[in-house]
Amino acid sequence: MAQKEIVSNRKALRNYEVIETLEAGIVLTGTEIKSLRDHGGNLGDAYVIVSKGEGWLLNASIAPYRFGNIYNHEERRKRKLLLHRYELRKLEGKIAQKGMTLIPLGMFLSRGYVKVRLGCCRGKKAYDKRRTIIEREKEREVAAAMKRRHH
């Protein structure tokens, strides 16, 4: 079954070097699901913590559902992630390393359920960001040259 990307965290890909990725389920209310289907989510400042054997998504913004009434949800509440115990232990070990953090890279629909794509990341320094930009420009120039050559 195809996965439909709902929300992506482009800021994370710019500011962090992704070492490893994994998928996790997330506990949401009905109005949060409906809002996400309307692309009402933002993962810009979001991060994940592991405490007491549970994974939590913090600072993820899911806009209030526009047709939700008094039962609407809080926009930046703490949301529980659904992970197996061995996955949580593995993540705790990764986060314990210096400079490592867990960042949500995106949210997608899989068989009607919202899943979160998590990345075990290390922060990029300014010179790493510049190097990435230079490499991307070189790749673009090579692709353009190849395209001109074949036409």
From Swiss-Prot:
Keywords: Cytoplasm, RNA-binding. Belongs to the SmpB family. HAMAP family: SmpB (MF_00023). It comes from Chlamydia pneumoniae (Chlamydophila pneumoniae). The gene is smpB. One of its GO terms (molecular function) is RNA binding. Required for rescue of stalled ribosomes mediated by trans-translation. Binds to transfer-messenger RNA (tmRNA), required for stable association of tmRNA with ribosomes. tmRNA and SmpB together mimic tRNA shape, replacing the anticodon stem-loop with SmpB. tmRNA is encoded by the ssrA gene; the 2 termini fold to resemble tRNA(Ala) and it encodes a 'tag peptide', a short internal open reading frame. During trans-translation Ala-aminoacylated tmRNA acts like a tRNA, entering the A-site of stalled ribosomes, displacing the stalled mRNA. This is SsrA-binding protein. Pfam families: SmpB. Its main location: cytoplasm. The keyword Transferase does not apply. The keyword Cytoplasm applies. GO terms for cellular component: cytosol. It comes from the Bacteria. It is found in: Cytoplasm. GO terms for biological process: trans-translation. Gene3D superfamilies: 2.40.280.10. InterPro entries: SmpB, SsrA-bd_prot, SsrA-bd_prot_CS.
